[in-house]
């Protein structure tokens, strides 16, 4: 017999994002057990059947089944992907009213099971709904995490790698703030192989500031472009969720731009927002406070204020 810890993830919501997340978990050897929960039982059961039929090809056997809220009791992570989808022309913040009501029911049911793990929230507007999950659950703030700007940061690094012709894993740069229209690039800390991008710009006149400005707009509007072309975004965010899940279950102490609670950091308080944070088995345990320049401070404060204005009528 073995006494090794068995990692368990409960996924709530088997839509585009949820099913893509489940597929990624199984193929990246991240968890030992995965339970899929959805109001549409046939969809969830169909996903589980489909995933299990490929088990012979998976790099690691993952015990996958369809379940209900009671199965959350001993889960290490409950990942919420359920909720109303963003429609073409609709902002993430337009979804607030619809999804707050949905989340109250979900979180209440999860907590009734005796759940005492970590919530990982993917549904938009993710910063608002992560705050709501924290309020509804009563869990410590570090054990409620949103996907935040992890995907935006990945998009940013990809675009920078293409522009500067460098491998994406050698690009170090962050997108912080609201996962949405007020997010910002931290240009003052962006570098490639430890060389600041500002230095690269000075050394080579083929690099233009207007190109970087356009790049930031492309990062900010990437989701809208994808939704317009294919109806929804799901692969990228699923991979971001899987990355956060790995950091938690494998106790990595990785720094990821998750949506986490601020209590004075960056001059803000009582808000969940995307910033670099230390992520491990205990959740988002420490906010990494970057020294922002004056422009970045102003942009970040604006992002915080937008979120607080949305939260104010509800909490």
UniProtKB/Swiss-Prot annotation:
GO BP annotations listed: glycolytic process; lactate metabolic process
Q: Which reaction does it catalyse?
A: (S)-lactate + NAD(+) = pyruvate + NADH + H(+)
What Gene Ontology molecular-function terms does this entry list? L-lactate dehydrogenase activity
Q: Which InterPro entries does the entry link to?
A: L-lactate/malate_DH, L-lactate_DH, L-lactate_DH_AS, Lactate/malate_DH_C, Lactate/malate_DH_N, Lactate_DH/Glyco_Ohase_4_C, NAD(P)-bd_dom_sf
Cellular localization per UniProt: Cytoplasm
- Give the E.C. number(s): 1.1.1.27
Protein's recorded name:
L-lactate dehydrogenase
Organism, by scientific name, is Bacillus pumilus (strain SAFR-032)
Q: Its gene? A: ldh
């Amino acid at each position: 017999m073995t006494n090794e810890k068995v990692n368990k993830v409960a996924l709530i919501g088997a839509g585009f994002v949820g099913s893509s997340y489940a597929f990624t978990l199984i193929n990246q050897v991240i968890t030992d057990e995965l339970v899929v929960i959805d109001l549409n039982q046939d969809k969830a059961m169909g996903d589980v059947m489909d995933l299990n039929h490929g088990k012979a090809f998976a790099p690691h056997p993952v015990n996958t089944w369809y379940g209900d809220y009671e199965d959350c009791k001993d889960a290490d992570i409950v990942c919420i992907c359920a909720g109303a989808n963003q429609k073409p022309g609709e902002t993430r913040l337009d979804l607030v009213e619809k999804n707050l009501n949905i989340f109250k029911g979900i979180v209440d049911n999860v907590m009734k099971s005796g759940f005492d793990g970590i919530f990982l929230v993917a549904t938009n507007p993710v910063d608002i709904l992560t705050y709501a999950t924290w309020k509804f659950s009563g869990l410590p703030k570090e054990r409620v995490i949103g996907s935040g700007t992890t995907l935006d940061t990945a998009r940013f690094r990809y675009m920078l790698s293409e522009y500067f012709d460098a491998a994406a894993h050698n690009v170090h740069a962050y997108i912080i703030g609201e996962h949405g229209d007020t997010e910002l690039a931290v240009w003052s800390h962006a570098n490639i192989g430890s060389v600041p991008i500002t230095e690269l710009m000075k050394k080579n006149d083929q690099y233009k500031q207007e190109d970087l400005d356009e790049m930031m707009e492309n990062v900010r509007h990437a989701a809208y472009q994808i939704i317009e072309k294919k109806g929804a975004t799901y692969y990228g965010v699923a991979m971001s969720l899987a990355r956060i899940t790995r950091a938690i279950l494998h106790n990595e102490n990785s720094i990821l731009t998750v949506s986490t609670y601020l209590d004075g950091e960056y001059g803000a308080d009582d808000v969940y927002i995307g910033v670099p944070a230390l992520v491990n088995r205990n959740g988002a345990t420490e906010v990494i406070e970057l020294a922002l320049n004056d422009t970045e401070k102003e942009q970040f404060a604006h992002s915080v204020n937008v979120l607080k204005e949305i939260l104010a009528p509800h909490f």
